[in-house]
């Protein structure tokens, strides 16, 4: 009898533990949703979508608010929008694939590839390597007098609000460049014979000595891939990244997209921006959905061999800067740089993105293998509240 009572007690305890685990599993998503809803409301976002992953599966998928506020169209897993500088991680993957194809190496001098010569007037005898483009120490900088004019808006495709246009004008954004290819733009920007050439397109030298985050330098890597591959960068990434991962609702240019699921991009909860592309589209112009982007995230976190070899992943995620001799203007307290990817000191690897009407973040935890992403259709000056929630969730074992 005593044995029976003991067994009964043990079974009761075991049942309680199992039920507790089930309840925890059921309430954790609700707890995460509550925290995200608080941040969503505090930031006055029109719409947002969050996905958490673990290995090859999605463990959390939830939308908040609207892709179209006026018509109350929910922001869903299939909603499409620009992802800003998260696009630079795609350049990283494309670059490593190009290296596997023996087009060049990270140490290749860009003048060994370009059809015109690039010289930093502040370092006339120096050279610029592909590696320095990937970690933003090349000495090429974003001249705001030119870069903000590289956005191409499509006001006739969708309704927009004049308040948003006025805001863009005040911020210096315009639609004044008529370049239609990376080749045209980079000749005009970097060649002394180019239409936009200026000493202001370059920072101090020598290359490798100073960190200056550069969209144009990032897109230059994509142009180098174009030169060696014979493909447009868009076609190269479709072939080696988007199609292998079945990212069927992702692309680079508005005319190539089905706009049915494209979110409106907002200045605030009411005023809408027109849709837009970028002349330097590789640096921030990928349009994708949370569902498609999660396929990419899971592939990267698992070192998926459909994209790259293990050696390429290792190279892509190797820290570029030493603590003893970092370049000027960078603080390694919170992050180092891989090949475009940010290597955060909290044990995660990722990248964020900003542009008019968008905010994004994508990351994975190198210890747990869990990852997360969020997309919102409004510029978010400070993503930290949302990022902290997701990073903490991904750290759980």
Give, region by region, the residue ranges found by the protein language model:
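Catalytic-site signature segments of enzymes, centered on catalytic residues
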Residues: 144-259, 280-294
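Active-site helix/loop module of the DD-peptidase/beta-lactamase fold
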Residues: 82-86, 100-158, 223, 227-272
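Catalytic loop of the DD-peptidase/beta-lactamase superfamily, centered on the K-T-G motif
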Residues: 26-63, 145-148, 152-154, 209, ...
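Short active-site loop at a secondary-structure junction
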Residues: 38-49, 71-133, 202-217, 281-284, ...
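Acidic-glycine-rich active-site phosphate/pyrophosphate-binding loop
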Residues: 63-71, 193-196, 265-270
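N-terminal leader/targeting segments and the immediately adjacent pre-domain N-terminus
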Residues: 2-7, 17-75, 81, 99-105, ...
């Amino acid at each position: 009898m005593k044995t029976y009572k003991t067994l009964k007690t043990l079974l009761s305890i075991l049942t309680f533990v199992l039920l507790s685990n089930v309840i925890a599993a059921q309430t954790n998503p609700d707890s995460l949703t509550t925290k995200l809803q608080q941040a969503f409301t505090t930031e006055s976002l029109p719409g947002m979508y969050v996905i958490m992953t673990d290995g090859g599966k999605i463990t959390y998928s939830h939308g908040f608010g609207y892709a179209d506020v006026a018509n109350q169209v929910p922001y869903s897993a299939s909603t499409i929008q620009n992802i800003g500088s998260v696009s630079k991680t795609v350049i990283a993957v494309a670059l490593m694939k190009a290296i596997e194809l023996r087009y060049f190496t990270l140490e290749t001098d860009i003048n060994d590839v370009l059809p015109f010569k690039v010289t930093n007037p502040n370092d006339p005898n120096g050279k610029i390597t592909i590696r320095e483009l990937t970690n933003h120490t090349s000495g090429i900088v974003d001249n705001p007098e030119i870069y903000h004019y590289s956005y191409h808006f499509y006001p006739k495709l969708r309704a927009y609000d004049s308040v948003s246009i006025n805001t863009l004008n005040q911020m210096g954004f315009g639609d004044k460049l008529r370049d239609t290819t990376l080749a045209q733009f980079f000749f005009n920007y970097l060649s002394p014979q180019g239409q936009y050439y200026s000493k202001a397109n370059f920072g101090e030298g020598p290359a490798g000595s100073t960190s200056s985050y550069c969209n144009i330098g990032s897109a230059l890597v994509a142009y180098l891939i174009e030169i060696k591959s014979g493909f447009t960068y868009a076609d190269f990434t479709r072939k080696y990244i988007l199609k292998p991962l079945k990212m069927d609702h992702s692309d680079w240019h508005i005319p190539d997209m089905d706009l049915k699921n494209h979110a409106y991009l907002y200045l605030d909860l009411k005023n809408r921006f027109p849709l837009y592309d970028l002349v330097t589209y590789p640096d921030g112009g990928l349009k994708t959905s949370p569902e498609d982007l999660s396929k990419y995230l899971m592939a990267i976190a698992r070192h998926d061999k459909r994209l790259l070899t293990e050696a390429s992943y290792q190279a892509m995620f190797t820290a570029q800067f030493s603590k003893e001799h970092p370049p000027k203007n960078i603080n390694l307290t919170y992050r180092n740089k891989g090949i475009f990817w940010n290597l955060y000191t909290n044990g995660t690897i990722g990248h964020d993105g900003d542009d008019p009407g968008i905010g994004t973040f994508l990351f994975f935890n190198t210890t747990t293998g869990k990852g997360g992403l969020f997309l919102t259709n409004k510029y978010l000056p400070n993503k930290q509240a949302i990022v902290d929630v997701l990073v903490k969730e991904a750290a759980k074992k």
